[in-house]
Amino acid sequence: MEYPLLDNTDLPLVLLGGTLCNARLWQPVIERLNVAAVSCITLTGAESAPQASRRLLEVLPPRFLLAGFSLGAIVALQMAADAPERVNGLTLISVNPLPVAPDTLASRREAVRTAQARGLADWLVSSLWQSYVAPSRLSDRILQETICRMAQECGIETFAGQTEMAIHRQDNRTAFNALSCPTLLLNGAQDVICTPHHHQLLAAGNANVTRHTVEAGGHFIPLETPDEIAPLLRQWITECIQC
């Protein structure tokens, strides 16, 4: 379905990608959304989620709509906690709001060293691909190539920095519960990284949340199921504009 152009120039849409993701993550969704003002941000140049939040808030417009995927959702949640008056709508996709378990820190940093030694694409396919997408998409070579290409374009330094952002994050559930803007939670039913339970933890505390589970989706639902994601995002954007 082709939508008419949606004028959101007063509330531009800001899209934050996840670990080893760039604008390619959002392209299928953007093509279907047809909105006037949208920007895609690759998370770099910060050593923690709070630092990433501060740096983005320094350069973004006074008011905007914010959507984040995975690590991008963690940073988006931090931004909404830091400046709720500026975030006029929030969408979190494939998010785990909980702090990182201390016993996983060493393995996360070791993953960066292994990826550097083996090459990002080879490491990703052997270590992460099985958990990235729904079982029905594991043989989808185009999808795999897209995700690997993003990783290679981001590079190992970006991966190392994003790993530190993910490690150094806060539990912002209390701040999330206090948000009054239109809020959307999207998750894949078959996501083993950011599970449906993680999204239930967030949805339970905020009466303004709309939650949708993509039954056929894994972790990478913006790429796996853009036809299902885009209408939900467009409806959310429309609601934000009308508020």
Task: Please provide the spans of the model-predicted regions.
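Gly/Ala-rich beta-loop-alpha elbow adjacent to hydrolase catalytic centers
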Residues: 68-72, 76
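Flexible "cap/lid" loop of the alpha/beta hydrolase fold
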Residues: 81-82, 86-121
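Short alpha-helix in the alpha/beta-hydrolase fold that links the catalytic acid
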Residues: 181, 195-204
